[in-house]
């Protein structure tokens, strides 16, 4: 087993030497019989015929180390440092970076803290009427009205949803009334009493004269008075009844006053 090391080394060396000899023979022999022990020529030509090329080492792109990242939760900061040797090469110019007009500092941090370059339109001043149009109130309502007035105004202003619900409710109530149900008709029935029609001064004066002559009218006389005063017989009859009741009340009050 100890002789396997030298034997294996000798076998490998012999294979390498034979391979190099076959390669040289196939390269420099233009015509000649190919021996059975020779190996096939390689398809890719060797580069020994061409002069060797040496490339100058190129300096690394980023020579300086990256700056440490400060943990800031409010602003996203990209720690990019300018490389002076990249100004001549246009491949490394970051064209997407826009010029920064100024720097913004944060007063909550120390005076020697880092200043971050921000655009002037990043933080816009809020306008007074931006957040007031969504709830239907204007800036003047908040300025001149109290909280109670605003709540009452919201409650008194009907919304389209409440109007639609109320109209639908009235329609349902009308549909529930059964014309064949006498109870429902009696509850929701309108008054059949005619509207009161007051007498004119001329009619009242003529009726008073007639009452002084006679407290009770016959049917013929009632018909004549109604025709003259442009009234119905029923109106004349009712007026005389009310006038008699009034006269009885007045006489009763007089008698009571005398007894006292």
From Swiss-Prot:
Gene Ontology CC: nucleus
Example GO molecular function: RNA polymerase II cis-regulatory region sequence-specific DNA binding
Principal location class: nucleus
Subcellular location per the Swiss-Prot or TrEMBL entry: Nucleus
DNA-binding region(s), chain positions: 192-251
InterPro entries assigned to the protein according to its UniProt record, in alphabetical order: Abd-B_homeobox_TF, HD, HD_metazoa, Homeobox_CS, Homeodomain-like_sf, Hox9_activation_N, HXA9/HXB9/HXC9
Region described as Disordered: spans on this chain: 153-181
Coiled coil: none
Record-level GO BP terms: anterior/posterior pattern specification; DNA-templated transcription; embryonic skeletal system morphogenesis; negative regulation of vasculogenesis; positive regulation of lymphangiogenesis; proximal/distal pattern formation; regulation of transcription by RNA polymerase II
Biased composition (Polar residues): 155-167
Superkingdom of origin: Eukaryota
PROSITE patterns membership: HOMEOBOX_1, HOMEOBOX_2
CDD domains cross-referenced by the UniProt entry: homeodomain
Keywords: Developmental protein, DNA-binding, Homeobox, Nucleus, Transcription, Transcription regulation
Pfam families assigned: Homeodomain (PF00046), Hox9_act (PF04617)
Record function comment: Sequence-specific transcription factor which is part of a developmental regulatory system that provides cells with specific positional identities on the anterior-posterior axis.
Family: Belongs to the Abd-B homeobox family.
Protein's name according to its UniProt entry: Homeobox protein Hox-C9a
